[in-house]
A protein has these predicted regions:
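Gly/Ala-rich beta-loop-alpha elbow adjacent to hydrolase catalytic centers
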Residues: 228-237
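Conserved acidic catalytic loop of the alpha/beta-hydrolase fold
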Residues: 204-225
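Short beta-strand element of the alpha/beta-hydrolase
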Residues: 84-92
Length: 356
């Protein structure tokens, strides 16, 4: 009887200890300040004619009206333990800032992970996406990248993106060893993160708006930003003015600057340290799927970029996660079950560069 009692007490102690550790891990966030602002963009010239305030919105011609367009929208959070190294986050294609804030299975996203480590978060919706939907040049149907050109009929893409993002061969299956959250609910939440452009994507306008975001962060904090990009956002990131960037962390960017190009030289001259991360299922992905070859080309291009960048006096690290023992990650490593492990690796890299 005594043995059973001791076993019960021990089990209860372990349960309570586990709960305490869980509570400690999920301690309340201490945020000193949070808010939103817009940055960049333009104001269109007035529509031909005179504005009549008596009819205002009833006048379908919109005569005399202007529009504020092509800006970025920023949600920011500043922790009480702010370490002076803010992070600006830029989403990829079909995404918004939501992807940095949570995971499909409801865990804390990278924005919160780094916030707990003292990095203020500046979460961007680029022009024409999310809460920055106003664009000067709208497509004829308003959603050119996901709607058919000749009608309002929606062009579905769940399965295509699932395969291309290397989550599995065909939804809902996952590749062996996958870190993507399991279950129908998590998959449903992931697909519902996808959001369209409100018009034609313009990389130059997006980069200009992000440059203004960086300038605003510098003005507000007095510090340059760590720039964390993903996928299509990586392509935008290489074009953003460098004067307010402390470092770039590119998560599977769609490409890297051509060696010797204006992009390349601008980054090199500014001595911007760069870390580029790639997940799994690239070298070991199905050869009959076109996306496997695409990601190999992108990864190999990044390795070539890093080799030249470093030889020219720059500082670029390409992290191939399987090669350092972190396996099972798709294109969305920051939303997967081992996302904290990868974030810790990034934090270590930032520390090596005096940025934490």
């Amino acid at each position: 009887m005594m043995k059973k009692t001791l076993s019960f007490i021990l089990a209860a102690f372990m349960l309570l200890s586990g709960s305490a550790l869980a509570e400690e891990a999920k301690a309340p966030l201490s945020i000193a300040e949070q808010g939103m602002f817009s940055a960049g963009g333009t104001v269109t010239g007035p529509v031909e004619g005179d504005y009549d305030p008596t009819t205002n919105w009833l006048d379908a011609t919109r005569a005399g009206n202007t529009a504020h367009v092509d800006h970025a929208n920023v949600l920011y959070q500043i922790p009480v333990n702010d370490n002076g190294h803010p992070i600006v986050y830029l989403h990829g294609y079909g995404q918004s800032r939501m992807g940095w804030m949570t995971t499909p299975d409801g865990r804390e996203g990278w924005a919160t992970y780094f916030l707990r480590n003292g990095h203020s978060a500046y979460l961007v919706d680029q022009p024409g996406r999310g809460e920055a939907g106003a664009q000067a040049s709208m497509s004829t149907d308003g959603f050119l990248d996901v709607w058919s050109e000749d009608s309002k009929e929606y062009k579905p893409g769940d399965q295509a993106w699932y395969t291309h993002f290397r989550i599995g061969r065909v939804a809902p299956e996952r590749y062996e060893g996958s870190q993507f959250p399991e279950g129908d609910e998590a998959q449903d939440q992931f697909f519902r993160q996808m959001t369209p452009n409100t018009g034609n994507f313009d990389q130059a306008k997006a980069a200009a708006a992000l440059g203004e975001v960086m300038a605003q962060v510098k003005k507000r904090t007095g510090n340059k930003s760590i720039f964390v990009t993903h996928s299509q956002g990586g392509a935008v990131g290489w074009d953003v003015p460098v004067e307010n960037i402390a470092a770039i962390v590119a998560i599977e960017p769609g490409g890297t600057p051509q060696v010797g190009s204006e992009q390349y030289n601008r980054l090199l001259e500014a001595k911007i340290p760069i870390a580029i991360y790639f997940g799994d299922y690239i070298d070991n992905g199905p050869e009959d799927i076109a996306s496997t070859g695409f990601w190999k080309q992108v990864r190999d291009g990044a390795l070539d970029f890093a080799e030249h960048y470093n030889a020219d006096g720059g500082d670029c690290t390409v992290v191939d996660l399987p090669k350092i023992g972190i396996t099972g990650n798709s294109h969305f490593m920051f939303q997967e079950m081992n996302s904290d492990e990868i974030a810790a690796n990034i934090e270590s890299w930032l520390g090596e560069h005096g940025l934490n």
